[in-house]
From Swiss-Prot:
The modification Phosphoserine is found at residues 413, 639, 662, 672, 688, 948, 952, 966, 971-973, 981-982, 1035, 1068, 1080, 1112. It comes from Homo sapiens (Human). GO terms for biological process: cell differentiation; chromatin organization; negative regulation of G1/S transition of mitotic cell cycle; negative regulation of gene expression; regulation of lipid kinase activity; regulation of transcription by RNA polymerase II. PANTHER family: RETINOBLASTOMA-ASSOCIATED PROTEIN RB -RELATED, RETINOBLASTOMA-LIKE PROTEIN 2. It is linked to Brunet-Wagner neurodevelopmental syndrome: An autosomal recessive disorder characterized by severe developmental delay, intellectual disability, poor or absent speech, infantile hypotonia, inability to walk, behavioral abnormalities, and dysmorphic features. Residues 21-33 have a biased composition (Acidic residues). GO terms for molecular function: promoter-specific chromatin binding; RNA polymerase II transcription regulatory region sequence-specific DNA binding. Glycans are attached at residue 420. Residues 8-17, 977-987 have a biased composition (Pro residues). This is Retinoblastoma-like protein 2. Interacts with AATF. Interacts with KMT5B, KMT5C and USP4. Component of the DREAM complex (also named LINC complex) at least composed of E2F4, E2F5, LIN9, LIN37, LIN52, LIN54, MYBL1, MYBL2, RBL1, RBL2, RBBP4, TFDP1 and TFDP2. The complex exists in quiescent cells where it represses cell cycle-dependent genes. It dissociates in S phase when LIN9, LIN37, LIN52 and LIN54 form a subcomplex that binds to MYBL2. Interacts with RINT1. Interacts with PML (isoform PML-1, isoform PML-2, isoform PML-3, isoform PML-4 and isoform PML-5). Interacts with RBBP9. Interacts with CD53. The gene is RBL2. The modification Phosphothreonine is found at residues 417, 642, 974, 986. Keywords: Cell cycle, Chromatin regulator, Disease variant, DNA-binding, Glycoprotein, Host-virus interaction, Intellectual disability, Nucleus, Phosphoprotein, Repressor, Transcription, Transcription regulation, Tumor suppressor.
Length: 1139
């Protein structure tokens, strides 16, 4: 490696082989360059494959396709572990692809059961899912096949969760199988005998999974599937009561039994009782939902089974199939029908949950209903834990608390089940929508009519159009199209109710913040309404099918995710009744958008950056000052990443710009880019290509208007900028007065809405001495004219120009800044409340939280953490193309590694990724599959700026890179060494299903670091090496808030909220009641309880205030800036209140 003097980092360390053996890897394997070279299949493998195909009776076409696929993969990748497992993946793909379905009938001879494939290949189901995901990556299978596999895994997960609920519920209704007497072998003519509890247990489960499979729209819906199970138990229980041996079947302690059940002469009623309501109350069900499933899905389906003779008995009241003469044939017919369904569809045979070897086949769970002893062996306990580990690993059916929210929300308690969590979420949704209709309320109608342009009809038309789009995506088999449409209609109706409810709350909040401002402009924003309805639909879908189906809804409505994220915080703040799981789900969605989805090549984000002169705002520009660390060692002035702050004067406030502590308004979120971006283009001069700058883009129309102000003797001309316009303050004009004297004076102008600037001279006399300008506009000095251009936001300022003055020539003053220097005026950065600023504020906050967590786990000092942050911010600001089609966490991990390397505090990528995997959002694909090279669409920016190119970023900004040595690393030296039976390496070249895309190259994180990242960052990172004593100042680091970010409603029945305590200066007038935790006496709590019970407010001057707060601690403390007298008065008041 060539030497680079003191500025060169040390060479990479040798591969940490010893450390790798101690590393516990969660995944089956890693992308590993040091893996053994791939080889062709051996004759032994081919022999095992032939034996496997013979046992499965595989047809020749699928057999040949599977072998060709396996041979191709084994030649390209190292397939570690059991060969049969990989062969099973190839066979499964071949079975699903090789034989087309000609009709909707069954194709029993063509499809091979997945359960048989797994059994013959000696592979558990969970192992199969892990291997299959990697096979899909290597074979680059199309998206629809991947979706099918994901749905298969989700169906399995739902069934596994429901089976764990099925066992205790069944035991609650029926007796234990252990209490049954063993059957005696009888003659052939005496076979028909009453059914047993064990047979009913098996029959009820098979009936349920057969029905669930025939409702594809709810087969992976946890809530509806659970209610379908309750319907099956309700039906079987009603039939059991009709049996002559009912007292041998039913649990005598079941709380749903009738009062006369234990009487000797009790007789069953002709119509079986309904115990849906009792089951819901005992086992976390929703009565309304369960009864709806029973009436609209279950009962019509069971009647069809009677019509097809699959169930025998009395069709009129759906009974009789448990009678001795009918049960055997019914059980046999249902089992056969289910087998045909599994073979035709290719789904998992979910009867394996009932098998004696269920642990080996699933990789999971032992049954509670077993004939053995009640105590489980250590082996069975270990096998039982495998399923839970799978759920924890895949985060199936649960929402992990995002890292940004772990300070505010506890994780679920161990006793909470996925079913109870899902039903609770849906119950909260029903509570929120009680009494509402899918139309605007009278209050909302009145608000909309007050707008200058009533948007009511446009809103209704938009919802109708979106409903039609939503319904079109629910078109399953013809037999169940009506059911699918009914579910789609129901979900959309709930979403409409929620939409109008939230819209009303949002408008009311906007009116409180903006006063009487007309909201027509915002309410006509199509992106806002589509995003809001999509958000409501996502909440409804999540309530029925956790963890939701994001981004399916945004895709069908074609809502750009950059716009969708804006409505999430608005939605959460506007609706206080959301349960914690929904809030976590929405927060997860927002984080996904911020960390990678908004950075896709087709995202509108790149257009926003282009409109901002291809400039990404810094963290200091978008963060409120109180949200930044201000340590003594952090120097702000002169930093290339943290330009010096200048005073802002807003045209709409009449004073200095205030830091933003209140939530950003909807108007700001969806407002157009500020005019400053257009103003800057006027003064941008073309840079030479060698400087790597951005050429000026001069619009064709003239932007500068010379306005002569003549014949004004004895009068004053007032020029008052309207709110939002900008007064340009740094330009010069050559002026000829009446006496012929020519002077050069400063001129000031106003930018109009078309992007042009109209200049006006500062007040001047014939002697050429500039006089003071009234208002807050200061005359420009010679030093200012020699500097760079800037502008100020002004308000309410009158520019007075007496005398006769004519502008002859206007020449912009100042010189073009060199590339790499940041412009230090307020015109060069977006407003803190602009949509682009809001996006990057959230991005920086998210990155800061994740980086702080990683640094704590890696034992990185605060000083190094700030250097890492500065490097990360540099990569976002100066090299935004590094984020295109990549992930925020990838840049964070690379920044940690490079800054630790240059400061001689080496942290291996192996340890960095190990700590990264502990974060809730972590996915192995983030470091396994990183974009290296690929053809992506060019942003049509009209500029030759190298950042507008999305191909190889290594060609960009060459002035920031050098040919010296850099801290490169080999993949084999950092990624964990694969363990036995590990997965194959991640493929590096994917051909893609899209023919118009050239071959895309992906690799692991180390390849990205060596080939792309370090070439962009090396020059900047080396400035912080120990050998460099003149390191640039560090960027301020965002700190983590200590208070809860939102208020919480304590009860749905009372408007009582809990939220962080505000500073005294920010409190509203004291007409409310206050209670300060750890400070106010208990007497106040008694008064509050009395007020809630009676509805009467105590006649006290002090009490409790639980309303929306800011970021202050909840504990009562006096503000530091209060006088001693106020603190003494507060102490006296508290003392008096305690007596």
């Amino acid at each position: 490696m060539p030497s680079g003097g003191d500025q060169s980092p040390p060479p990479p360390p040798p591969p940490p082989a010893a450390a790798a053996s101690d590393e516990e890897e969660e995944d089956d394997g890693e992308a590993e360059d040091a893996a053994p070279p791939a080889e062709s299949p051996t004759p032994q493998i081919q022999q095992r494959f032939d034996e496997l195909c013979s046992r499965l009776n595989m047809d020749e076409a699928a057999r040949a396709e599977a072998w060709d696929s396996y041979r191709s993969m084994s030649e390209s990748y190292t397939l570690e572990g059991n060969d049969l497992h990989w062969l099973a993946c190839a066979l499964y793909v071949a079975c699903r692809k090789s034989v087309p379905t000609v009709s909707k009938g069954t194709v029993e001879g063509n499809y091979v059961s997945l359960t048989r494939i797994l059994k013959c290949s000696e592979q558990s189901l969970i192992e199969f899912f892990n291997k299959m995901k990697k096979w899909e990556d290597m074979a680059n299978l199309p998206p629809h096949f991947r979706e099918r596999t994901e749905r298969l895994e989700r169906n399995f997960t739902v069934s596994a969760v429901i089976f764990k609920k099925y066992e205790p519920i069944f035991q609650d209704i029926f007796k234990y199988p252990q209490e049954e007497q063993p059957r005696q072998q009888r003659g052939r003519k005496q076979r028909r005998q009453p059914c047993t509890v064990s047979e009913i247990f098996h029959f009820c489960w098979v009936l349920f999974i057969y029905a669930k499979g025939n409702f594809p729209m709810i087969s992976d819906d946890l809530v509806n599937s659970y209610h379908l199970l309750l319907c099956a138990l309700d039906l079987v229980y009603g039939n059991a009561l009709q049996c002559s041996n009912r007292k041998e079947l039913v649990n005598p302690n079941f709380k749903g039994l009738s009062e006369d059940f234990h009487a000797k002469d009790s007789k069953p009623s002709s119509d079986p009782p309904c115990i849906i309501e009792k089951l819901c109350s005992l086992h976390d069900g929703l009565v309304l939902e369960a009864k709806g499933i029973k009436e609209h899905f279950w009962k019509p389906y069971i009647r069809k089974l009677y019509e097809k003779k699959l169930l025998k008995g009395k069709e009129e009241n759906l009974t009789g199939f448990l009678e001795p003469g009918n049960f055997g044939e019914s059980f046999k017919a249902i089992n056969k029908a289910y087998e045909e369904y599994v073979l035709s569809v290719g789904n998992l045979d979910e009867r394996i949950f009932l098998g004696e070897d269920a642990e080996e086949e699933i990789g999971t769970l032992s049954r509670c209903l077993n004939a053995g002893s009640g105590t489980e062996t250590a082996e069975r306990v270990q096998m039982k834990n495998i399923l839970q580990q799978h759920f924890d690993k895949s985060k199936a059916l649960r929402i992990s608390t995002p890292l940004t929210g772990v300070r505010y929300i506890k994780e679920n308690s161990p006793c909470v089940t996925p079913v109870s969590t899902a039903t609770h979420s849906l119950s909260r949704l029903h509570t929120m929508l009680t009494g509402l209709r899918n139309a605007p309320s009278e209050k909302l109608e009145q608000i909309l009519r007050t707008c200058s342009r009533d948007p009511t009809q446009a809103i209704a038309n938009r919802l109708k159009e979106m409903f039609e789009i939503y319904s079109q995506h629910f078109q399953p088999d013809e037999d169940f199209s009506n059911c699918a449409k009914e579910i789609a209609s129901k979900h959309f109706r709930f979403a409409e109710m929620l939409y109008y409810k939230v819209l009303e709350s949002v408008i009311e909040q906007e009116q409180k913040r903006l006063g009487d401002m007309d909201l027509s402009g915002i309410l006509e924003q199509d992106a806002f309404h589509r995003s809001l309805l999509a958000c409501c639909l996502e909440v409804v879908t999540f309530s029925y099918k956790p963890p939701g189906n994001f981004p399916f809804i945004t895709e069908i409505f074609d809502v750009p995710l950059y716009h969708f994220y804006k409505v999430i915080e608005v939605f959460i703040r506007a609706e206080d009744g959301l349960c914690r799981e929904v809030v976590k789900h929405l927060n997860q969605i927002e984080e996904q958008i911020l960390d990678h989805l908004a950075w896709k090549p087709e995202s509108p984000l790149w257009e926003k950056i282009r409109d901002n002169e291809n400039r990404v705002p810094t963290c200091e520009e978008v963060m409120p000052p109180q949200n930044l660390e201000r340590a003594d060692e952090i120097c702000i002035a002169g930093s290339p990443l943290t330009p010096r702050r200048v005073t802002e004067v807003r045209a709409d406030t009449g004073g200095l710009g205030r830091s933003i502590t209140s939530p950003t308004t909807l108007y700001d979120r969806y407002s157009s880019p500020p005019a400053s971006t257009t103003r800057r283009r006027l003064f941008v001069e073309n840079d030479s290509p060698s400087d790597g700058g951005t050429p000026g883009r001069m619009p064709p129309q003239p932007l500068v208007n010379a306005v002569p102000v003549q014949n004004v003797s004895g009068e004053t001309v007032s020029v008052t900028p309207v709110p939002g316009q900008t007064l340009v303050t740094m330009a010069t004009a050559t002026v000829t007065a009446n006496n012929g004297q020519t002077v050069t004076i400063p001129v000031q102008g106003i930018a109009n809405e078309n992007g042009g600037i109209t200049f006006f001279p500062v007040q001047v006399n014939v002697g050429g001495q500039a006089q003071a300008v009234t208002g807050s506009i200061q005359p420009l000095s010679a030093q200012a004219l020699a500097g760079s251009l800037s502008s100020q936001q002004v308000t309410g300022t009158t520019l007075q120009v007496p005398g006769q003055v004519a502008i002859q020539q206007i020449s912009p003053g100042g010189q073009q800044q060199k590339q790499g220097q940041s412009v230090t005026s307020s015109s060069n950065r977006p407003r803190k409340t602009s949509s682009l600023s809001l996006f990057f504020r959230k991005v920086y906050h998210l990155a800061a939280v994740r980086l702080r967590d990683l640094c704590a786990k890696l034992d990185i000092s605060d000083e190094l953490r700030k250097k890492i942050w500065t490097c990360f911010e540099f990569s976002i600001i100066q090299c935004p193309e590094l984020m295109m089609d990549r992930h925020l966490d990838q840049l964070l991990m690379c920044a940690i590694y490079v800054m630790a390397k240059v400061t001689k505090e080496d942290k291996s990528f192996q340890n960095i990724m190990r700590c990264y995997r502990t974060q809730p959002q972590a996915r192995s694909q983030v470091y396994r599959s990183v974009l290296i090279k690929g053809k992506r669409k060019r942003r049509n920016s009209g500029s030759s700026d190298s950042r507008s190119h999305q191909n190889s970023p290594t060609e960009l900004n060459k002035d920031r890179t050098s040919r010296d040595s850099s801290p490169v690393m080999r993949s084999s030296s950092t990624l964990p060494v694969p363990q036995p039976s590990s997965a194959p390496p991640t493929p590096t070249r994917l051909t893609g299903a899209n023919s118009d895309m050239e071959e895309e190259e992906r690799g692991d994180l180390i390849q990205f670091y060596n080939n792309i990242y370090i070439k962009q960052i090396k020059t900047f990172a080396m400035k912080y090496s120990q050998a460099n004593m003149d390191a640039p100042p560090l960027s301020p680091y965002p700190f983590v808030r200590t208070g809860s970010p939102r208020r919480i409603q304590l009860s749905q029945n009372h408007p009582v909220y809990i939220s962080p305590h505000k500073n005294e200066t920010m409190l509203s007038p004291r007409e409310k009641i206050f209670y300060y935790f750890s400070n106010s006496p208990s007497k106040r709590l008694r008064e509050i309880n009395s007020m809630i019970r009676t509805g009467e407010t105590p006649t006290k001057k002090r009490g409790i205030l639980l309303e929306d707060g800011s970021e202050s601690p909840a504990k009562r403390i006096c503000p530091e800036n209060h006088s001693a007298l106020l603190r003494r008065l507060q102490d006296v008041a508290n003392d008096r209140g305690s007596h």
